[in-house]
């Protein structure tokens, strides 16, 4: 019985494109019409050539032969913010270039295309050095970067080679009242009505190779771009997502699940709630603060809400309990295998050893390390030490003034008061820094100590500072209190608890054993921000309320939520006018028996962070949407995928086209797209 608990579920999996041939039969049974070579090939143009890593944390896709690129609004949010000001508030009002000359360059923004991936397990086992393999791959082309990534906790190794382009320009973005409609209120929620897209263009040198920004650069010509389907989706239609999911932990044991559900997530949720409340209150008072903290707030809130859904999902599915049952069945089998007989016992011991240290690192990272003044003081002391080690004098005043340019003392002090207090309440008393305990006792509480520190520190004032000022500053003394904790936390700065070496060493044999034992399970490697294929179908769902949730949302839902007095739901007047006249033009559809415009849809694709911006394609390989989210309780799919409730949320490509046309007035962009 327990052996079936984690047998691969329908639509579960994040498959390596180079090995997708093993899944084609199943994909075709669901409606896929293309071949494995159409998805991934190094010998001819394939769909992989139309997909990019966007900005280091998202996915994007080419829409034209002239480098036009589509991703999520939230993926480009920080870049749009960097181009915005009170006078040119592109976050609030959107931006639409009317010509190539109006496309706005974004310093530091890059996109990377996968050139190839290949397994190098045997080469490494034969004695080749990883650095030599990587160096040889990088030398094969201009702008190439390469890495060797571990699959199945090191049982297999794959080389990934990318080409990175550094001239990326903003072409168009809807106002946040469309691109972030629903804001954090609707984040991870269904039904959803967010026009979460932005449009960019990649530029290259004369040879179509990567080049630094130049007015002489030409639009990049991709080997492949997506045809855009305007026919839409119906429930049951095949869907495929091609992107770069960031992090899953499908094979961790029950100890890891329990830590996330009962300790880690609840602590992080509580601390982030307080930071968000402080920032939100300040944003409500000032347009300048609202813009300055827009991306920061979104970054904090995104994981904050995700973790809440993750806890709900893990508890509802009883994931830890099921893992324990699965482990018991595994252990019965393992007793006849000397190499595996004591494996789980050793893993449990390793978790017991590591969890206190890892929790300390997470607590520190979510509290003290979020204080801007602390981070500045610590980095300033480190920079001075480096300079003195080289026989130089560090320019502390220049660093001081650079820090103050974007520093909000009021917000940071409010955050510091709460975070120091929370740290003191949550830290193991035996790990409480003695000097911190003394200071808090002297001032009569954590918040009073913080107020005194901020009041006396010269690092936060406008007057010039010197090296002697730094050495005796109250903030510097505060930073030094945490020196040991900071150093130790860096030793535990792993992607997940289970990646700590003391634990991870056991996962390589554990994964090998699982694949030997559980032969009915379709294994796929955990996501690690490498290119993957996920597939499923358009589908609604029924949850605990016993109400069926349809898989398509419409413009009617936007208008039902519209409220000029609520920031998250205040849509542009032009959209109200279009709706009032039902003037949808070519984008009108009959949906649920009435004339409307589709906005978002649900599907059963297995996704994770990093899949934001991923193309959603139909069985013919045509673009039908842009992935941007999961439903709230689906976030536990990073640890367990359940097809009954796990749904990814995508913005319908027809809504994207509708906004480009009717709101942006940029229908000229259609001339370079392939619409079908």
Language-model-detected regions and their locations in the chain:
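Bacterial N-terminal signal peptides
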Residues: 1-4
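Terminal presequence/propeptide segments associated with secretion/organelle targeting
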Residues: 6-676
